[in-house]
């Protein structure tokens, strides 16, 4: 699993049980040698030198760690592109026609369709709202970490049932409790 810094350099432990971080046991992978790999991706790495420290290049991305990114839309020329909140995602994402449902400055959830290290294509799957609004930023944080902002129907139904039967539930519970 490759770990990419904000500056774009990747590090990968020489072995699974090696300590994580920038230790001498890590293989250093320069940004131009990541070949489209992103932070957390499971990759195959080829060792290309060992002195003064191990250096390598990504041969193959085995599995993407993440396919959805919270982004902010900005205008480039006559089209909107999405810039990821995660500074380790190095390029703007071309969201094509899916940008029609949003406007410049909106926070959006983008599904990554392709990324080769220099160009990225994706599609907007959710417009979160205008950047800077408290509710929007809170939802963006939740989505960035892979959680949903929507509750499943069965949870919503249970919440409605509790609301309807609130008084009965309270009176039943009070009888079961003992004050000390």
Label every model-predicted segment.
Residues 1-180:
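Charge-lined substrate channels and their catalytic hotspots, especially those that engage the 3′ end
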């Amino acid at each position: 699993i490759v770990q990419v810094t904000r500056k774009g350099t990747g590090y990968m432990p020489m072995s699974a049980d090696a300590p994580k971080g920038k230790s001498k046991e890590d293989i250093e992978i320069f940004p131009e040698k990541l070949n489209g790999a992103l932070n957390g991706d499971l990759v195959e790495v080829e060792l290309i030198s060992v002195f003064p420290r191990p250096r390598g290049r990504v041969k193959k991305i085995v599995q993407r760690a993440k396919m959805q990114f919270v982004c902010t839309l900005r205008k480039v020329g006559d089209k909107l592109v999405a810039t990821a909140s995660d500074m380790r995602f190095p390029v703007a994402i071309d969201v094509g026609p899916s940008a029609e449902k949003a406007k410049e400055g909106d926070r959006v959830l983008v599904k990554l369709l392709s990324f080769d290290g220099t160009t990225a294509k994706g599609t907007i799957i959710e417009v979160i709202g205008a950047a800077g609004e408290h509710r929007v930023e809170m939802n963006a944080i939740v989505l960035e970490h892979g959680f949903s902002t929507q509750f499943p129907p069965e949870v919503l139904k249970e919440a409605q049932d509790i609301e309807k039967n609130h008084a009965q539930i309270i009176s039943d519970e009070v009888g079961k409790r003992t004050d000390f």
